[in-house]
Amino acid sequence: VVSTSFQKEIPFETQTQKDSTLYIGETVTVTEGKAGAAEIESETVYKNGAEQSSRILSENVIIKPVSQVVRVGTKTKDVLKSGLLYPLKGTISSYFGERWGRNHEGLDIAVAEGTPVKAAECGTVSFAGDGGSYGNLVKIDHGNGVVTAYAHLNEINVVVGQAVNSNTQIALSGNTGRSTGPHLHFEIVKNDVPLDPLNYLKNRNS
């Protein structure tokens, strides 16, 4: 029988507080979380050098963890009025409107595979996964019926329900789904109606 003692880290919890003065997707850390520690006493039984059983005799908290407190925004922004950021820089290879006899509902921006894709505005991820012909797809809900979509991705770096700030990396560009070459397909939708992104993008794409 061998008795041992060791310390174990106690992870901290994260508490969220809704804040109507912050926009959706914005967060402010009020209190930084700190892990705690516990002193563990254990007993292990060996027979002929082989471990037979082990049990915890006692567990005493010596440092209490400090919870992390984060304020989460609930205020909606009129992103169409204030303008959105280009999700990446590259050459526009296809514009919004009719293309090959059908309506093209966004912008195609030609870039090398693996180019970081940024959120055009703060919001909450409403979809992240296989979008069929869109390939790997991310959608961000910006409130007031406005959603942006980022398609043909190689890699997705966010999950559904995650709050993101503007210009936060959400993915890497790619060539997945129905695609004729490496590019990002970017859409802006208001109440399920596609809009021409060029009317609402505010930074120079160069």
Predicted segments, located by residue:
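Membrane-proximal envelope biogenesis segments
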Residues: 1-83
